[in-house]
Amino acid sequence: AEMQVQYREIVTPEVDATVQALAAQHSVTFSDPVAMLGNARTAALTGGGRISVRGPMREDEAPVVRPYLLTDDIEAAIAAAEAAGAEFAMRATPIPGEGTFAIYFLGGIEHGIWQN
């Protein structure tokens, strides 16, 4: 089995500069802001999935790069993370037309889970 990054989220107060740099470095075009994704601007990743760049959604949301790994069973993935000691910031949350995601903290790192 292999792991696949389905969604890589960059949260930064410098959205325009980050999008401009990534677009120029990789010759890609980012979308207009997508409301369902927190006004993230997205671009396709090689092999499937997307990268997104968005601003903080809360005053206390720190900049972060958070990969969301694809799973066939998000509830089983949540249970496995909990068994390893993870604390969840967001449990399985559907985004209509996009998929279902969860966010957890483990070892001082933010992790994401994604099910299509």
Residue spans of the language-model regions?
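Vicinal oxygen chelate
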Residues: A1-I10, S31-D32, E82-N116
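Surface-exposed charge patches
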Residues: Q20-A21, A79, L106
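Mid-chain, well-packed structural core segment of small domains
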Residues: P63-E82
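Conserved short beta-strand elements that form part of the metal-binding/catalytic scaffold
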Residues: V28-V64, Y104-L106, E110-N116
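Residues at alpha-helix termini
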Residues: A24-Q25, A83
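Short alpha-helical
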Residues: A17, E75-A76, G99
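N-terminal beta-strand motif that seeds the catalytic metal site of vicinal oxygen chelate
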Residues: A1-Q20, A24, V65-P67
